[in-house]
Amino acid sequence: MTRTVLVLNSGSSSLKFQLLEPDSGASLADGIVERIGEDSSSASLVCGEREVTHSERVPDHEAALRTAYGLFDEAGAELGSVGLVAVGHRVVHGGPDLYQPTLIDDALVDTLESLAPLAPLHNPPAVLGIRGARKAFPDLPHVAVFDTAYFHDLPVAAATYAIDRDLSEQWHIRRYGFHGTSHQYVSEQAALFLDVPLSSLSQIVLHLGNGASASAILGGRPIDTSMGLTPMEGLVMGTRSGDVDPGVLVYLWRTAGMSVDEIETMLNKRSGVRGLGGEIDFRVLHQRIESGDESDRENAQLAYDVYIHRLRKYIGAYLALLGSTDVIVFTAGVGENDAAVRRDALSGMGRLGIELDEHLNESPSHTARRISAETSPTTVLVIPTNEELAIARACVEVI
């Protein structure tokens, strides 16, 4: 029987799940439970030609898992009869010691719980998903795959913050980096697409989704990345601020009377594109820029301009770090689907060897494609990410 792996990605109010054949790369089923804990919860699963949906309240992540399993049964893909060999779990933060794909036991779950302060939006729901899945599949191996793994061996100068060294060492403060599974996957896919050795390429990878990060990759090894100790640093994101002067936080604490928890919530949930423009969906943002009332238009335009400004700064910095860049890769929801973001991120960079083909950039596609001009010294690609497949393949290597 063909081997399959169930991959779970637990968010604060959602559970994404996918059933894959790691050997062939085929996705057998793909689903999501959204708005967990709210009255308007919804769940859907696409399995082959069949789509199953539910709209019933899902109070917690354990209930979300039961809902997911029910969707599989309803779609005729009972998990007990599809050759399931492992359950893979995306875990955002593994701290200083956890970075290789790791078999999950009770001690590991306790460790992941202790790391919640490093990824308060991501690690707690991941632990809930792990606990629920281990109850549902007690006889299967469960594997944690860490977002931070790919960046574990960053150059010391890139990983080190210029703060008191004793404090850094005592509290394991360093640049960990995130979206590593995605950055590694698409950089490898870029080499395959171009039919050249990965070791020969210098790349800038731009993972632009609700969370967003950039990386500079030389010869298949990352030499810098935009996210840091936590997933808050770097690019402007859907609800996260990205880079911000630490003095702003001290000022808000001292002068505005905000607590540490309030500041953290503001940075994580009420900043970024939402904080400036009141919206995280770039499709809506573009609509407001084009046809909103004056206030909506100004706010949306400011959010977009700040987003692009920060993105261009990182591209420029990574061009300088790499010296020259063979490939720039856009991936994730915004990176794969928003032609305007890609255009504006790279506009005016012809002297740096980066030229887009306007027609190719505007042409939608769900497969890897080149969008740079034939005359462009730097190749620009759009490559769909597939973190779930990468996680599934990591699982079978461990078990």
Swiss-Prot record:
Substrate binds at residue 90. Its EC number is 2.7.2.1. Mg(2+) binds at residues 9, 387. Mg(2+). Can also accept Mn(2+). Gene3D superfamilies: 3.30.420.40. The keyword Nuclease does not apply. It catalyses: acetate + ATP = acetyl phosphate + ADP. The active site is at residue 147. Pathway: Metabolic intermediate biosynthesis; acetyl-CoA biosynthesis; acetyl-CoA from acetate: step 1/2. The keyword Lipoprotein does not apply. Its cofactor is Mg(2+); Mn(2+). ATP binds at residues 16, 207-211, 281-283, 333-337. It comes from the Bacteria. GO terms for biological process: acetate metabolic process; acetyl-CoA biosynthetic process. It is an enzyme of class 2 (transferase). Its main location: cytoplasm. InterPro entries: Ac/propionate_kinase, Aliphatic_acid_kin_short-chain, Aliphatic_acid_kinase_CS, ATPase_NBD. HAMAP family: Acetate_kinase. Homodimer. Belongs to the acetokinase family. This is Acetate kinase. The gene is ackA.
